[in-house]
Amino acid sequence: MLDFGSGAGLPGIPLAMAKPDLAMVLLDSNSKKTRFLQQMVIELPLPNCLVVHARVEKYDEVFDQIVSRAFSFLADIATKTAHLLTADGEILAMKAQLNDDELHQDLGAFEIATVQKLNVPYLDADRHLVTLKKR
């Protein structure tokens, strides 16, 4: 699984902790963030995590699942990660605000498979999990 634009490691670090059998790649283009992630992987320890400092456009591994949180519009996520996803893979995008305009954007080779509203304890704001699949 790839957590791209990992930032502080969300959701990649909690997923790796909850599923130690899951190989997780934490990808970010910001070296300060990847140094922080590397230290977390060492300290926790999380042997199932690999931290990669690279731009998503330049990275070339292939994954069955890609997760993203607070990155950008769905169309941008689909465009930037299309080359990293297997033919039957899926992108799991965590979104806060989700409006009709974004849901009807051209997603290129992708389509929206599901939109699930999430309930976050102690948070009175909308959150969604959008699953994208290749057409």
Report each predicted region and the residues it spans.
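Short beta->alpha hinge that forms the Motif I/post-I loop of the SAM-binding pocket
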Residues: 28-32, 73, 96
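Active-site capping/gating segments
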Residues: 25, 96-135
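Short, conserved active-site loop motifs that form the nucleotide-linked donor/cofactor pocket
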Residues: 49, 89, 113
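Conserved SAM/SAH cofactor-binding pocket of Class I
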Residues: 1-68, 78-79
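Conserved beta-strand signature within the Rossmann-like core of class I S-adenosyl-L-methionine
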Residues: 88-98
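Helix-to-beta-strand junctions that scaffold the AdoMet/dcAdoMet cofactor pocket
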Residues: 19, 85-87
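Internal catalytic or translocation cores that form aromatic/hydrophobic pockets or channels
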Residues: 75, 81-83
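Short glycine-rich, flexible loops that bind phosphorylated cofactors or substrates
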Residues: 74-75, 100
